[in-house]
């Protein structure tokens, strides 16, 4: 059950700094306050983390769309990135609305979960990513940044692998070599 300060403190420890308990604590707190939210959101959308993927039947709005689509739907407030819709059809997003010609739409999307629900492997990978971002503004040490870049890439790869274990592998549908054997 991590908090944003736990994650930031892990990142600071990776670059040899002291942990913080608020974003008003010196240079480290200021840097963390400015980089945490965007880094977290970018990292959440870097892959389809299973704990951050949701499915939702969208609420149709009564307003008539002003474009070529027949229907408008309200997007969820925690949306970070759409993945796709069901039925699978052409759609467009403008501001906080999705437009489609279907009268009902289910959206698969990446959302922003609370930090307390992050799995340990994601916390570790996000902390490494933050450490890379913090290295120059806090330590002004290019060697440290390069080391954290390598560490962040390694922990990301491991975290993505662990997260992928939570779903059934996709079956290979097209098998040209088997079809040739007849």
Language-model features and meaning:
Residues 1-182:
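Glycine-enriched, solvent-exposed interface loops adjoining structured elements
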